[in-house]
Amino acid sequence: MNIRSNPQQTVPAVTTGPLSSSRKIFASPDAAPDLRVPLREIILSEGAGEPNLPVYDTSGPYTDPSVTIDVNAGLARSRKQWVLERGGVEEYEGRQVKPEDNGNLSTDKAARAFSAYHKPLRGLDGHKITQLEFARAGIITKEMIYVAARENLGRKEQLERAEAALADGESFGAEVPAFITPEFVRSEIARGRAIIPCNINHSELEPMIIGRNFLTKINANIGNSAVTSSVEEEVEKMVWAIRWGADTVMDLSTGRNIHTTREWILRNAPVPIGTVPIYQALEKCNGDPVKLTWELYKDTLIEQCEQGVDYFTIHAGVRLSYIHLTANRVTGIVSRGGSIMAKWCLAHHKESFLYTHFDEICDLMRKYDVSFSLGDGLRPGSIADANDRAQFAELETLGELTKIAWDKGCQVMIEGPGHVPMHKIKINMDKQLRECGEAPFYTLGPLTTDIAPGYDHITSGIGAAMIGWFGCAMLCYVTPKEHLGLPDRNDVKVGVITYKIAAHASDLAKGHPAAQLRDDALSRARFDFRWSDQFNLGLDPDTAKNFHDETLPKEAHKVAHFCSMCGPKFCSMKITQDVRDYAATLNDPNSIGMSLSGTAEDGMKQMSAKFKEMGSSVYLDAEKVKESNRVL
């Protein structure tokens, strides 16, 4: 349902309440029993004969009926205490909001500001601040304990079939363990193979981990534009996206009220929030890339660090010497951030200030533990341009920048394409692992063909499933509106569900120990004609139920042994059940029939005798066979 926490004021209305036949449960890790790690438990019907199924949950408190949601106040700031307990930080006044932060709007056009203000924190010199620094020092943080419990879906020990699942999969060199421990999480972060995006000022966050040895994650993009959307719509899009499974959300707003929109989102977001700071910096100079300066960009970084943004897309790999490599492309430079920096470089005939000031960017981001998402500004925008020299030159530079960021103590992931046909996808994954020291890869799709506007969630979902299998850690969703317009609420859901399918399929292929539990539970429900369980175990129970009820809407149909596809006489699963029931009677010593094995044996004897009677020849006269069959 949609609720407004205060109907007298204009505040966002958001979707709350549990998903169908689900409830919020919490795991308490042995290493930190005070932590409450959220899971969603799918409640099965009484006749299921099996326990309820816990699944990963990204929805935050919005699906917890015991929590009163007040969007105007924001979520509980539980993680702030963790940060303060570790020490090494200070609270300070912070930067004042400036008119240009929201597009120099007049009072009547400005969105309502978020009412609660919290002084920001920043790290002190000489102290460990980032998750990478703690991991390298051998220190397991509460965030690491938390994500380990999430990845195990609350289990305290490995599954019985964990080793078999790992052996059955093909991981392409990934090292997925049978059970995730906090120590394993620490070691992966220390090696740079995983990140926990968690700005020390995003206290509302429920920590999660991104890395190829963990569950494949997905990101949903939201954000306004100069022509459409509002603060209210974007906050609801965020809540809606995480309801259906988005692990992180990027606010890509390019219109007005950028600062205010981001503040509302962050204060109500239980998942990591990412941005592309160059978008807001460009708005501050009235959309003219030539007027961008390092000082303006740095001020924007500080603004967003203090608000609590968890990761920044920074296109520092777009170098002056690479721009000419795009000249003969079919679609040129398609990244907004990449095209902005390319124009600046050409106008000033200088190296990008993102590249020349990269050390300073690292020092700044480290103080707040903001993770890098090193942007692929030269990614291919068509399959004709896939894997060209421009794309790979930038990727090689991103590898160099990764090492610099690691040396500075910053967490890093790498962004990838884009538009890539199926046979060229694995080359991308292998090169990224090699060039970037196995830092997590985060890709937009990739789209595997360019012929389907309106269906690019499908063209990209194919590539996403493949690259996830090959080792990509996080998949950025694509909606049906890709290349066509700003996605609305329904487009967000379609994009998220499509990418949850791709991510889950890649986990199955890698042999993730827990991945197949849900598949098997749904398959059993399907075979047993437990329609409600089948709906509820799916990624989108509402749509599954609606499709079923279009033709069989009555409640009695929820227990029927058929659906409208085949009807009662041609249901393969019902026929299989009948065969099993018949076989069971044959094996019953009290049955009037004989045993199944006996029936088969007698049948073989009859056919053997017939073969001999016909002359024991492999090739027989057709007329003799017909005559023999008439006799039989």
UniProtKB/Swiss-Prot annotation:
Gene Ontology biological-process entries: thiamine biosynthetic process; thiamine diphosphate biosynthetic process
Compositional bias segments (type: Polar residues): 1-23
Disulfide partners: none
Binding locations of substrate: N221, M250, Y279, H315, S335, R336, G337, D376, G377, L378, R379, E415, Y442
Highest taxon of the lineage: Bacteria
Gene for this chain: thiC
Upper taxonomic lineage: Bacteria, Pseudomonadati, Pseudomonadota, Alphaproteobacteria, Hyphomicrobiales
One Gene Ontology term, aspect cellular component: cytosol
Binding positions ([4Fe-4S] cluster): C563, C566, C571
Organism for this UniProt entry: Bradyrhizobium diazoefficiens (strain JCM 10833 / BCRC 13528 / IAM 13628 / NBRC 14792 / USDA 110)
Cofactor: [4Fe-4S] cluster
Pfam families recorded: ThiC-associated, ThiC_Rad_SAM
Region feature Disordered, mapped onto this chain: 1-26
Enzyme class, UniProt record, top EC level: lyase
Catalytic activity: 5-amino-1-(5-phospho-beta-D-ribosyl)imidazole + S-adenosyl-L-methionine = 4-amino-2-methyl-5-(phosphooxymethyl)pyrimidine + CO + 5'-deoxyadenosine + formate + L-methionine + 3 H(+)
EC number: 4.1.99.17
NCBIfam families: PRK09284.1, PRK13352.1, thiC
Subunit structure of this chain's protein: Homodimer.
Residues that coordinate or bind Zn(2+): H419, H483
Similarity comment text for this entry: Belongs to the ThiC family.
Role according to the record: Catalyzes the synthesis of the hydroxymethylpyrimidine phosphate (HMP-P) moiety of thiamine from aminoimidazole ribotide (AIR) in a radical S-adenosyl-L-methionine (SAM)-dependent reaction.
Keyword vocabulary terms for this entry: 4Fe-4S, Iron, Iron-sulfur, Lyase, Metal-binding, S-adenosyl-L-methionine, Thiamine biosynthesis, Zinc
Example of a GO MF term: carbon-carbon lyase activity
Cofactor note: Binds 1 [4Fe-4S] cluster per subunit. The cluster is coordinated with 3 cysteines and an exchangeable S-adenosyl-L-methionine.
Protein name per Swiss-Prot or TrEMBL: Phosphomethylpyrimidine synthase
Pathway listed: Cofactor biosynthesis; thiamine diphosphate biosynthesis
